[in-house]
C-alpha cells in the first residue's frame, strides 16, 4: 500500500501488515490500560490502628466517669487514630508481551490511516527553537491537536513545541500507544515511517 506525502507530489510504499491491518479494539484497550497501569507509582501507604504511634493503655476507667467507654486511643474513630481500611503500597504493573504491544501499535497506526489522521511529510523541522515559527508552520498545514513523530530527536523542534497546547514531539523510539491515540492528528516524517516499519517488523 501507499501513503501520500503531503509536502511532495509522491507516495511512500509501506507495509500492509503495519499500516493496513484490521482494528483490534480489545487488544488496543488491553495494551493502553496496561501502559497506564505501568506508569502508576503505587507507593501510597496509610497506617492501621496497629501501626500508628501511641499507647495501648485504656484512656480512662470503664465506669463512673459519665463518658462513653473506651479501650484505646488508636481506633479509627479517634483523632490521630489508624485508618479503617488503610491503603498499602501496591504493584499495579501488568505484563504485555512484545507481540501484543507491536500488534496494538500496528492496529492504532492502521486505524489512523483509515481515518485520515496520519499525515506523512518528507521532512519537518524548524530553523530555531522558536514556538512562533512552529505555530506558523502548523497553522499553514491546518494542524492544531498534533503529535509530531521524527526519526531522531530534534532539539529545536522539541523546544519549539514545549510551550504549545496539544502539540507534542516524539522520536520513533519514544512512541507509545497512549500518545498515538491522544491526539487528533499524527504528523510523521518519511524517515520515521521507515523506522516504524523496521521496529514493528
Swiss-Prot record:
One GO cellular component term noted in the UniProt record for this chain: ribonucleoprotein complex
Organism phylogeny: Bacteria, Pseudomonadati, Pseudomonadota, Gammaproteobacteria, Alteromonadales
Protein name, per record: Large ribosomal subunit protein uL4
Pfam assignment, any one: Ribosomal_L4
Entry keywords, A to Z: Ribonucleoprotein, Ribosomal protein, RNA-binding, rRNA-binding
Entry annotated with the keyword RNA-binding: yes
Functional note: One of the primary rRNA binding proteins, this protein initially binds near the 5'-end of the 23S rRNA. It is important during the early stages of 50S assembly. It makes multiple contacts with different domains of the 23S rRNA in the assembled 50S subunit and ribosome.
Membrane recorded as keyword: no
Similarity comment: Belongs to the universal ribosomal protein uL4 family.
GO annotation (BP), single: translation
SUPFAM superfamilies to which the protein is assigned, alphabetical: Ribosomal protein L4
SUBUNIT field: Part of the 50S ribosomal subunit.
Entry's Gene Ontology molecular function annotations: rRNA binding; structural constituent of ribosome
Region feature (Disordered): 45-71
HAMAP family in the record: Ribosomal_uL4_B (MF_01328_B)
Record organism: Shewanella sp. (strain MR-4)
Amino acid at each position: 500500500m501507499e501513503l501520500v506525502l503531503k509536502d511532495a507530489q509522491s507516495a511512500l510504499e509501506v507495509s500492509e501488515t503495519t499500516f493496513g491491518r484490521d482494528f483490534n479494539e480489545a487488544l488496543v484497550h488491553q495494551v493502553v490500560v496496561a501502559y497506564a497501569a505501568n506508569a502508576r507509582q503505587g507507593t501510597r501507604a496509610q497506617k492501621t490502628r496497629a501501626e500508628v504511634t501511641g499507647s495501648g493503655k485504656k484512656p480512662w476507667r470503664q465506669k463512673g466517669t459519665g463518658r462513653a467507654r473506651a479501650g484505646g486511643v488508636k481506633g479509627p474513630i479517634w483523632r490521630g487514630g489508624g485508618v479503617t481500611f488503610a491503603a498499602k503500597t501496591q504493584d499495579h504493573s501488568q505484563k504485555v508481551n512484545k507481540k501484543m504491544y507491536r500488534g496494538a501499535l500496528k492496529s492504532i497506526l492502521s486505524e489512523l490511516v483509515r481515518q485520515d489522521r496520519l499525515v506523512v511529510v518528507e521532512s519537518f523541522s524548524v530553523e530555531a527553537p522558536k514556538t512562533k515559527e512552529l505555530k506558523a508552520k502548523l497553522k499553514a498545514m491546518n494542524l492544531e491537536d498534533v503529535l509530531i513523530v521524527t526519526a531522531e530527536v530534534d532539539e529545536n523542534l522539541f523546544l519549539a513545541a514545549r510551550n504549545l497546547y496539544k502539540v507534542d514531539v516524539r522520536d520513533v523510539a519514544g512512541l507509545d500507544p497512549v500518545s498515538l491515540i491522544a491526539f487528533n492528528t499524527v504528523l510523521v516524517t518519511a524517515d520515521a515511517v521507515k523506522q516504524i516499519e523496521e521496529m514493528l517488523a
